[in-house]
Amino acid sequence: MVHSSMGAPEIRMSKPLEAEKQGLDSPSEHTDTERNGPDTNHQNPQNKTSPFSVSPTGPSTKIKAEDPSGDSAPAGPPPPQAVQAHLSQVQLMLTGRQLAGDIQQILQLQQLVLVPGHHLQPPAQFLLPQAQQSQPGLLPTPNLFQLPQQTQGALLTSQPRAGLPTQAVTRPTLSDPHLSHPQPPKCLEPPSHPEEASDLEELEQFARTFKQRRIKLGFTQGDVGLAMGKLYGNDFSQTTISRFEALNLSFKNMCKLKPLLEKWLNDAETMSVDSSLPSPNQLSRPSLGFDGLPGRRRKKRTSIETNVRFALEKSFLANQKPTSEEILLIAEQLHMEKEVIRVWFCNRRQKEKRINPCSAAPMLPSPGKPASYSPHLVTPQGGAGTLPLSQASSSLSTTVTTLSSAVGTLHPSRTAGGGAAGGGAAPPLNSIPSVTPPPPATTNSTNPSPQGSHSAIGLSGLNPSTGPGLWNPAPYQP
């Protein structure tokens, strides 16, 4: 290859040598050939790299760049040695620029056409050392080659990150340290799962323990939230405490709320060791009732021993509703609080009403029976109509109920004691007098008729008059 490359400039320069054959010597021709040698040696590697260059304009630009040097040689008289050295340097600069342009075209084609982007990297790296070896004496020329090399490295490293992230991850041949950077955070998550699971178990256990101890101390969820707000400055609602006990809060909020509740629980148990000491929420504020007014804290459920319960049962059988002094006496005898004894009697009376509703009712007259027609009718003397007697359970007096303007129904009345005057009789309704029991068969009107015989009713005035001939009892005829 060296001989062929050396022959090319000899043929090219033979035309000007034949034109000025007499003025040139053979040493000068040999010197010109040697000076053009590096240029030809530098062009041959470019011709070798032409298969990698997709653009067909590369060789044409080389020929155009070589033509001015070829035309300028035969134009003037025989140039001196300094002029030839300058021309060879200019040719080297032009070839260096051509190489830089070809490298940039290759890089652009790698970005736009070739997807992998790493198959053309070895030829480009192989091309640059040859260009540097062919020019050992020139300083500006290596700078031209280093600049494309740096840009090539930058483009090759940035191309997989920007345009092809999926191919860069799947291809094991690429050795880019930036491609494996997003993967380590995924590996950090699994070690945190055992710790999170243990924390969840601990939170669940604490929530159950907190609820049991809170109920044992007699605090409500609202009391806990308000007490924490007054004591520690973190006010929580009843819903928040309820969701914490039910494990319905987020993991972050559960972890944030746990130390506060644990601190409050320890303080509450410490303060409630002695029953005389107030609870933590009472130290900070008066507890609120349902209507928002100051009230009292819910008391603990009182457990009554068996022997005390038997004594209370005996007292209840003797007197179901003792007075305040009797309750105080019973409390002193049983060494109990007066309020506890009073509440027990109230609850016991309610229980007795549920068990025996009839025995607990007061002794009152039985309610009235439904109306039933008498088998006999009483016909007044004036013939105004028939008035059957009815039986009512009110008291000594009986009333007359009129079903119509002329006919009324009355049932016989059972009275505890009846007089002749019919004491306590109701006022007349539409000039209808009260009803009194009749005498048995005589004119004596002081005793009621125990046989339930027919009564005599006077319609003329308030006081009835009983006498023979006023009433004619007649049997009921349907």
Swiss-Prot record:
One of its GO terms (biological process) is regulation of transcription by RNA polymerase II. GO terms for cellular component: nucleus. SMART domains: HOX, POU. The keyword Plastid does not apply. One of its GO terms (molecular function) is RNA polymerase II cis-regulatory region sequence-specific DNA binding. It comes from the Eukaryota. Residues 1-82, 167-199, 275-298, 357-391, 409-478 are annotated as: Disordered. Predominantly expressed in B-cells. Its main location: nucleus. Residues 38-60, 275-285 have a biased composition (Polar residues). Residues 297-356 bind DNA. It is found in: Nucleus. Keywords: Activator, DNA-binding, Homeobox, Nucleus, Transcription, Transcription regulation. Residues 195-269 form the POU-specific domain. Residues 389-410 are annotated as: Leucine-zipper. Residues 12-37 have a biased composition (Basic and acidic residues). It holds the Pfam family Pou. Transactivation activity is enhanced by transcriptional coactivator POU2AF1. Residues 416-425 have a biased composition (Gly residues). Belongs to the POU transcription factor family. Class-2 subfamily. Transcription factor that specifically binds to the octamer motif (5'-ATTTGCAT-3'). Regulates IL6 expression in B cells with POU2AF1. Regulates transcription in a number of tissues in addition to activating immunoglobulin gene expression. Modulates transcription transactivation by NR3C1, AR and PGR. PANTHER family: POU DOMAIN, POU DOMAIN, CLASS 2, TRANSCRIPTION FACTOR 2. Interacts with NR3C1, AR and PGR. Interacts with POU2AF1; the interaction increases POU2F2 transactivation activity. This is POU domain, class 2, transcription factor 2. It comes from Sus scrofa (Pig). The lineage of its organism: Eukaryota, Metazoa, Chordata, Craniata, Vertebrata.
